[in-house]
Amino acid sequence: MADQLIRATAADGGIRAVGVITTRLTEEARQRHKLSYVATAALGRTMAAGLLMASGMKRVGSRVNVRVKGDGPLAGILVDAGLDGTVRGYVGNPHIELPPNAKGKLDVGGAVGNGYLYVVRDIGYGYPYSSTVELVSGEIGDDVAHYLVTSEQTPSALMLGVFVGASGVTAAGGLLVQVLPKAARDEALVAKLESRVGALSGFTPLLQAGKTLPEIFHDLLGDMGLTIFPESQILRFHCGCSFDRVLGALKMLGEAELQDMIVKDDGAEATCDFCGRVYQASSEHLAQLIVDLQTESSVSG
């Protein structure tokens, strides 16, 4: 099944639902960063959460940054997701492994530890909206749901899942169901929705059982006036890094530092944290940057 995002509404627009399949992009992240099992689960859940949150933004080019900063051995998570369906991310310690938790599952909460969730929404106006909440469990799903209720005052049910086997990621994705103000006053409706979401064993078991996103929507909201939008959105792991950007960053170091790199290292190497791509800048590249800096200095002087 292709990585995709599908939207739906129910209860005359009082319920908003978004589902994502992120199996392939999570596997790509695992391979790029050489992630351990628990690191794959942690990053995969956070990427799915980022895409779900970004899906509610309106302006073209809008993006959301999700940073999980805990005191656990994973050493943090950073994800950048866009309304356009692109996502990238990394963890501080990609190779960490822990014993299973009390439920026999990957111990994402133990890897993350105690700390905070930071969310920055950039809607393209130059004034990003940021918010911080304390982590509830470190399992990502609970933490993002807590953020949505606390910071956006929107009752939300969020399921995230990543299944990692010996051959890699075989199922990953998530589901976000939000009760909007027009339906929040219907206590019976809210109770029914909470009961159904609570009865689910998780998101990845549904995918492993062969369920599609429309089928999952029907199971949850089929008798609540469900409308599934026919357009699905393709999702993919994508990083906007480039050699030109690397040169721009190196140029900011200044002449003395660049000259030192030429003498000591015969060039420079840079690795993108988000995608793991390695860039090599030769001594000739660095020499040209020095020339550019000298030219700019003489012009401005």
UniProtKB/Swiss-Prot annotation:
Molecular-function annotations in GO: protein folding chaperone; unfolded protein binding
Task: Identify the domain of life.
Answer: Bacteria
Q: List the disulfide bonds.
A: 239-241, 272-275
Q: Name one GO biological process term.
A: protein refolding
**Gene Ontology annotations for the cellular component aspect, listed alphabetically:** cytoplasm
Q: Which InterPro entries match?
A: Heat_shock_Hsp33, Heat_shock_Hsp33_C, Heat_shock_Hsp33_N
Write out the PTM section of this UniProt entry.
Under oxidizing conditions two disulfide bonds are formed involving the reactive cysteines. Under reducing conditions zinc is bound to the reactive cysteines and the protein is inactive.
Where is it mostly found?
Answer: cytoplasm
Quote the subcellular location field of this record. Answer: Cytoplasm
Keywords, comma-separated and alphabetical: Chaperone, Cytoplasm, Disulfide bond, Redox-active center, Zinc
Described by its record, this protein's role is as follows: Redox regulated molecular chaperone. Protects both thermally unfolding and oxidatively damaged proteins from irreversible aggregation. Plays an important role in the bacterial defense system toward oxidative stress.
HAMAP family, per database record: HslO
Similarity comment: family membership: Belongs to the HSP33 family.
Q: What is this protein called?
A: 33 kDa chaperonin
Cite the source lineage.
Bacteria, Bacillati, Cyanobacteriota, Cyanophyceae, Nostocales
